[in-house]
Regions:
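C-terminal amphipathic alpha-helical
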Residues: 139, 147, 269-290, 308-419, ...
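Structured, contiguous alpha/beta core segments that scaffold functional sites
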Residues: 1-312, 316, 322, 326, ...
Length: 467
């Protein structure tokens, strides 16, 4: 009799070609990759220019943010900051408030020891191949395409920094599988990466980020759901439209047939000779840029039969535009940024804000939260006051428009000039008058001078000076 393991392996061999899935076995439990995640890269990002453009718009935003190591000095402000920064419609006023809370909650670590010094080094160069910004962007790219992001930490196994990462790598999520135990809830015990060989890592070494997955099967819910899975039909249609359009241009063949429909020419030989003469005349007299606009004349009745339809007539180009809009919606990217809808300065500015707040910041925040969780659990900094975060102040498109600020503050009856300068992002003026209320009459002046002037006017109705 076959052992239970042999029987399960036999089941795996039967299931793999039928399901298009990959399986691992841990204590008799099959763990399946829920769908062919490699296809989202092969048939999406690698060959579809719309998907490529959308994903890279997001990744370019992600690369902008610098990272730093902090210590928490105000837990309450940190919670408020995290709550604000998770909003996908962050207003300029809320953005300014978030910057203030971040400064109040976190203090940069400047005097590093051997442990925090290594962590600071990783925030510059996580491995031999990438900067930290590129490393974060690459991981987010996997998450956008496959729904999963795996960070492997090569932990030091001895010395003063034992348990601390010495390097960080992204595992390609399309070829990484989860190893799990049976039972409910399903428990992850490790991860398996299939490259030039099979590599297995305990769960303590890997940080796994994923999008929520409502699909339950053989532990399918342990994997994230790829956004492109919901757009699978749109991608398939768009790729087919591009193939049809390319085929039309590359294999154009005959566009039309010119025929003789003259009752006076009845014999086949005569029609053939006339067709031949017409062809020669068209080639010699009516082709080329210099002959554009010439009118051809024939003494015989002739006709034209069009063959096939153009991509415009087939509606391919219009369908591609709508596919682009739908794919933008999947990722929360404004379609103005890939040029499929009309653009003006104002809507491009608003689109850049939406790209940052709706697409880039959620990915950056997720990376930060998972990284800090691993530092406080498995990566050597349990119980220590260290906090990794990105600097959101570089996204200046989120701040309020200075012209709008000046416009509404100038309409106030009374305002302190330094308040106006601060709102506009300028440093306060040290002149004490700039901290006083100024009022708007015919012009602007300090409230104190305005009040003295009003008293003088009341005491001297004839505008006589008082000694």
């Amino acid at each position: 009799l076959k052992s239970l393991k042999d029987r399960i392996q036999g089941l795996e061999e039967k299931a793999l070609p039928l399901q298009g899935q990959q399986f691992s076995i841990v204590n008799g439990q099959l763990t399946a990759t829920p769908d062919n995640k490699k296809s989202y890269i092969d048939n999406g990002y690698s060959v579809n220019d719309i998907v490529y453009s959308i994903v890279n718009l997001i990744l370019d935003k992600i690369r902008v943010a610098p990272w730093g190591l902090y210590k928490v000095v105000d837990e309450s402000s940190l919670k408020s900051y995290n709550g604000l920064i998770r909003k996908k419609n962050l207003s300029g006023k809320e953005y300014k408030r978030a910057l203030s809370l971040h400064q109040k909650a976190l203090e940069p670590i400047t005097n590093a020891n051997s442990s925090t010094g290594k962590l600071m080094e990783l925030l510059k160069w996580p491995n031999d191949e990438e900067t930290y910004n590129d490393y974060v962007a690459a991981g987010c790219g996997y998450k956008l395409l496959t729904g999963d992001k795996y960070q492997w930490a090569n932990l030091l196994d001895m010395g003063a920094n034992k348990g601390i990462p010495q390097e960080l790598w992204n595992l390609p999520s399309q070829v990484t599988k989860i190893l799990a135990l049976k039972g409910f809830p399903p428990r992850k015990v490790g991860y398996q990466f299939e490259g030039d060989g099979i590599y297995q890592y305990p769960k303590e070494e890997v940080s796994h980020e994923l999008y929520w997955n409502p699909n339950w099967g053989i532990n399918q819910q342990l994997n994230g759901m790829a956004p492109l899975k919901a757009a699978l039909k749109t991608i398939t249609r768009n790729n087919s439209a591009k193939d049809a359009s390319s085929s039309k241009f590359q294999n154009n063949g005959l566009e039309a047939v010119i025929y003789v429909d003259e009752p006076g020419i009845s014999d086949a030989q005569g029609k053939h000779q006339h067709a031949k003469a017409t062809k020669q005349a068209l080639i010699s007299e009516y082709t080329g840029t210099k002959n554009q606009g010439k009118i051809a004349v024939s003494p015989y009745k002739m006709g034209v039969a069009n063959l096939g339809l153009s991509p415009v007539e087939l509606g391919i180009i219009e369908a591609e535009k709508w596919d682009a809009v739908l794919l933008c919606a999947i990722y929360g990217v404004p379609p103005e940024l890939i040029g499929v809808v009309s653009k003006t300065y104002n809507n491009v500015v608003e689109a850049e804000k939406a790209l940052t707040s709706r697409s880039a910041l959620p990915l950056l925040t997720s990376h930060r939260d998972n990284y800090n969780r691993k530092l406080q659990t498995d990566w050597g900094f349990r119980g220590q006051n260290v906090y990794v975060d990105y600097d959101v102040s570089v996204y200046t498109e989120l701040q309020e428009d200075v012209n709008q600020i000046l416009d509404w503050t100038n309409k106030l009856i009374a305002v302190r000039p330094n308040e106006q300068r601060t709102l506009a992002g300028l440093e306060a003026d040290p002149d004490p008058l700039m901290d006083q209320l100024w009022v708007t009459t015919a012009g602007r002046q300090p409230l104190e001078d305005y009040q003295i002037g009003a008293v003088d006017e009341a005491l001297n109705p004839d505008n006589e000076n008082v000694a």
